[in-house]
Design a protein with these regions (language model features):
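Single conserved hydrophobic/aromatic residue that forms the stacking wall/gate
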Residues: 1-5, 9-10
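Short, basic/glycine-rich phosphate-binding loops at helix/coil junctions
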Residues: 12-14
Length: 183
């Protein structure tokens, strides 16, 4: 559905070397543009397993969108699913923007933990090995967006995931829209 090329990727190698599949060239957008496809109430599956393999740029863009909408008095909260914990530039920025309504299966961010404890965000603590199966079996309903980190898209269109795959396959199969962040 969309490709996000982060600044990290651009400094390392030209984005054209990372996205070698010609039909995808026209799909490249900024993180801010991609964030416009994530809406209030969406169920969002993100790649990653611990502090690796999660999207780096898009969570900040989604957090900025949430802050702007909150300043206008509009609601913006999403349900976030991953393979495990992420890091401050994912869970942390979304929590600080009060953009998370529900989080599963794991959290290690102190701001988000406070929100769970004060009831402003919901949390489901399940065994990590069950989370993908529950998504696959439809326990949570439809997913609107999957945000997957990758290091490259080959000439044949194969997506090369980064260092932590987590529940990528389950999120891709469950989501209406897929955003691939190239890092």
């Amino acid at each position: 559905y969309g490709l996000v090329g982060s600044e990290m990727c651009i400094r390392d190698r030209p984005l054209s070397e990372r996205i070698a599949y010609a039909p995808f060239e026209k799909l490249v957008v900024s993180a801010e543009e991609a964030a416009q496809h994530v809406n209030h109430g969406d169920r969002v599956g993100i790649s990653g397993f611990t502090g690796a393999g999660y999207p780096k740029g898009l969570p900040t863009a989604i957090a900025e969108k949430a802050k702007a909408l909150h300043e206008k008095g509009e609601e913006f909260k999403i349900d976030v699913f991953s393979g495990a914990s992420t890091a401050p530039d994912c869970d942390g920025v979304l929590a600080e923007a009060e953009a998370i309504r529900f989080r599963s299966p794991y959290n290690s961010d102190p701001t988000l933990r406070k929100q769970f404890n004060d009831g402003t965000a919901l949390y489901q603590d399940i065994h990590l090995s069950h989370s993908g199966q529950q998504v696959e079996e439809g326990f949570y309903g439809d997913f609107q967006v999957a945000i997957i980190e990758a290091v490259r898209i080959t000439e044949e269109g194969h997506v090369v995931p980064s260092s932590a795959v987590g529940n990528n396959l389950e999120f891709i199969e469950a989501a209406d829209k897929i955003i691939i962040e190239i890092n």
